[in-house]
Amino acid sequence: MVPDAKHAPLPCPCGRPAYDRCCGRHVGTALPAPDAETLMRSRYSAFVLDRREHLLATWHASTRPAAIEPPPPGLRWLGLEVRQHRLTGPDAAEVEFVARSKLAGRAHRLHERSRFVRDQGRWFYLDGEIDPPVAG
């Protein structure tokens, strides 16, 4: 049986199944992500959906900017590939990922190794190392 398109769940921007059962459980809610990879996926979804409040709320206070600029007009996020997720300590983790986007007809890849910390039981984005951008 084919699901009714009107009631089919929206796909999650992070590439996993339904948004409401994936990143939608964390973006704009008080439910903390259970691990750094889940938090990183929810942050990617927040970038796709322009939910800057989630990005700020999940950024560690020690490195959080005062504000996040809106995305450039016409930016389209095309996909996320998580390459590695590893614990680096009892309350620290790294997630390596590639996020693809398109702007003004040009494709771009963002390759980052992000660092996360668990503070008072919640995971937060700390910072990341970004490889030089690749266009094309």
From Swiss-Prot:
Q: Which family does it belong to?
A: Belongs to the UPF0225 family.
Q: Which organism is it from?
A: Methylibium petroleiphilum (strain ATCC BAA-1232 / LMG 22953 / PM1)
Q: Record's InterPro entries?
A: NTF2-like_dom_sf, UPF0225, YchJ-like_M
* Name listed for the protein in its UniProt record: UPF0225 protein Mpe_A2093
Q: Which Pfam families match?
A: YchJ_M-like
Kindly give the SUPFAM superfamilies that the UniProt entry links to this protein.
NTF2-like
